[in-house]
Amino acid sequence: MARTLGSHAKHTKPKISAIALNLFSEQGFAAVSMRQIAAKAGLQAGALYNYFPDKQTILSELLINHMENLLETWSAQVLPDEPNELLKFFVDFHIDYHLNRPEEVFIAYMELRNLSDDNFRKIEKLRGKYELILSKILTDGVKEDLFSCKDIKITSLAIIGMLKELNTWYKKDGRVSVLEVKYIYKEIVLKAVS
């Protein structure tokens, strides 16, 4: 029997993905076997290959889905027109999106090294689209004499680098609230471009 009695194929692939995400974020990609993923999903090891040909495919799909969802979620936002407000909105958006997805964010940054060259390029392309969003905000702000950036690309990467590190240290029950963190981060970002 390839599938646990009562399971449904249409629910199995998302279940496998969720289990793999959890295992990769807890143990690291290299430490997790296909057999472990199958066992947690209630599948025989061989049945897992009906959904994913290998562990690399699971990882790449998780990372691609994370980046595509990030871009789609941004695209669905009602954005302010003014660059100052849009930059603050970007900071808030990034913080909210990433703090609500700790496992996805962890593997998105920590497991890039385990991607094949082709899959790495796919993720880099999607990350580049996200970086372009911030670069455009900064470029528009510079054009309107609201921001001063010697190098838009470096400034964008520095801001995103600072924002992405939030997931490594922020604790919901820590000494500062999310609102306080957002306020401080927006202040830092605005000072960096003034």
Predicted feature locations:
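N-terminal intrinsically disordered/low-complexity leader segments
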Residues: 1-11
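Helical hydrophobic small-molecule/effector-binding pocket
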Residues: 88-109, 156, 160
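Amphipathic alpha-helical packing segments from all-alpha helical-bundle domains
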Residues: 68-71, 118-143, 153-157
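Amphipathic alpha-helical linker/stalk segments
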Residues: 62-88
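Amphipathic, non-transmembrane alpha-helical scaffold segments
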Residues: 9, 59, 63, 67, ...
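Amphipathic alpha-helical segments used for helix-helix packing
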Residues: 99-118, 168, 172
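Helix-turn-helix
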Residues: 4, 15, 19, 23-57, ...
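C-terminal peripheral helix-coil segments that are non-catalytic and often amphipathic
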Residues: 1, 93-96, 100, 132-140, ...
